[in-house]
Amino acid sequence: MNQVETQKTNGEKRVADVDRKRILVIDDDLPLRGMLAAALRQAGFQVLLASDGGEGHRALTIHRPDVILLDLAMPGINGWDFLQRLKETGFLGTCPIIVLSAHLHVEPQAILQLGASAILPKPFNLPELIDLIEHLSP
């Protein structure tokens, strides 16, 4: 592992961002995105945020995240369309996708068949989510 240490102003050392796992959060719920960003950063991850599948796809192509957290029900390009777009453009399978959704009335198997690696219903347990990210990420 290639770690680069940097000095903080108070003299503490920390590992620079180059080796932290990059998580892309795609969700239209601004408060939830903020909560996830804060919690994931505190857990040591780099965090990228997108409010819909279109922004998420752009972030994916530019930043190449290690894991994607994806909501299904969003305006614009929703989670279903995002998964389909990944399939069509060849990005499906390049990183694990964890679906986070309060609307799991659809058969979970359909979500997995579209390319999701795992599903967590909202509300979810944050430590469980972090464990799942660690388990699925390269």
Kindly give the residue locations of the regions a language model identified:
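Charged docking surfaces used in two-component/phosphorelay signaling
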Residues: G34-Q42
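Acidic, metal-coordinating helix/loop segments flanking the phosphotransfer/catalytic sites
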Residues: L49-V67
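Receiver (REC) domain active-site loop signature in two-component systems and cognate sites
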Residues: M74
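As written
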Residues: G79, I111-L120
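C-terminal output helix
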Residues: F124-E134
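Active-site residues of response regulator receiver
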Residues: D71
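Acidic catalytic/metal-coordinating carboxylates
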Residues: D52-E55, N78-Q84
